[in-house]
């Protein structure tokens, strides 16, 4: 930065010196005084700016290259600190089943372990569980014979004598005898009428006398 500032100051001094020199020459020619001074000053300023820009650009490129090179050097690690990647691990193949057990036994064992871990059961176990639950709800279970016996016992409890037709007929006859003590006996009924007639007529109806 200090070098660039010094160069700029030198360029300005040169420009000013040239401007004053042209000013002195311009006094001899008063007609072209204004135009000559401003034109020359403008040209000198443009040349000075071009030179300063070129010098500044060259210094910047040199400095940038040096900085960039320094960054590269700082980023590069020495070989002593470099660590090699670890060797690849040997991948061991998983054992599908032991040599002592057959594949079918291993699959069965695997299925049992999976059900035990996940809490899943087979359909057969589920059906057995549902049957046990039904038996607990209904102690004897849905037995048709036992159900028929139970209904017959309930009917007997409702009707103690049971629906026996023969016994029912005997019961009706006994009820009739209780209502009529002598019972509806035709022969006995005829004897009763003859006795009543004898009582009505003491001598009785003698056919010969009649």
From Swiss-Prot:
Residues 127-198 are annotated as: 4 X approximate repeat A. Residues 1-21 form the signal peptide. GO terms for cellular component: extracellular region; host cell cytoplasm; host extracellular space. One of its GO terms (biological process) is cell differentiation. CLE- repeats lie at residues 136-147, 157-168, 178-189, 199-210. A- repeats lie at residues 127-135, 148-156, 169-177, 190-198. InterPro entries: CLV3/ESR. The keyword Signal applies. Residues 21-83 are annotated as: Required for secretion from the host cytoplasm to the host apoplasm. It is found in: Secreted; Host cytoplasm; Host extracellular space; Secreted, Extracellular space, Apoplast. Belongs to the CLV3/ESR signal peptide family. This is CLAVATA3/ESR (CLE)-related protein 4A-3. Keywords: Apoplast, Differentiation, Glycoprotein, Host cytoplasm, Repeat, Secreted, Signal. Residues 116-210 are annotated as: Disordered. One of its GO terms (molecular function) is receptor serine/threonine kinase binding. Highly expressed exclusively within the dorsal esophageal gland cell during syncytium formation in host plants. The keyword Secreted applies. Mimics host plant CLE extracellular signal peptides that regulate cell fate. May play a role in the differentiation or division of feeding cells (syncytia) induced in plant roots during infection.
């Amino acid at each position: 930065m200090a070098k660039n500032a010094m160069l700029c100051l030198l360029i300005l001094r040169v420009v000013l010196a040239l401007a004053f020199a042209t000013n002195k020459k311009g006094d001899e020619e008063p007609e072209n005084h204004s135009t000559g001074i401003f034109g020359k000053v403008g040209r000198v300023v443009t040349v000075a700016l071009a030179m300063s820009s070129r010098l500044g650009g060259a210094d910047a490129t040199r400095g940038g290259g040096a900085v960039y090179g320094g960054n590269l050097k700082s980023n590069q690690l020495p070989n002593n600190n470099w660590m090699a990647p670890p060797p690849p691990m040997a991948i061991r193949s998983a054992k599908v089943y032991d040599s002592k057990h057959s594949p079918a036994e291993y699959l069965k064992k695997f299925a049992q372990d999976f059900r035990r871990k996940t809490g899943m059961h087979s359909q057969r176990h589920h059906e057995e569980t549902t049957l046990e639950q039904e038996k607990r709800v209904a102690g004897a279970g849905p037995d048709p014979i036992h159900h028929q016996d139970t209904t017959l016992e309930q009917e007997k409890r409702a009707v103690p004598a049971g629906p026996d037709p023969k016994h029912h007929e005997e019961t009706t006859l006994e009820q009739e005898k209780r209502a009529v003590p002598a019972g509806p006996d035709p022969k006995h009924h005829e004897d009763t009428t003859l006795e009543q007639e004898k009582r009505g007529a003491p001598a009785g109806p003698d056919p010969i006398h009649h």
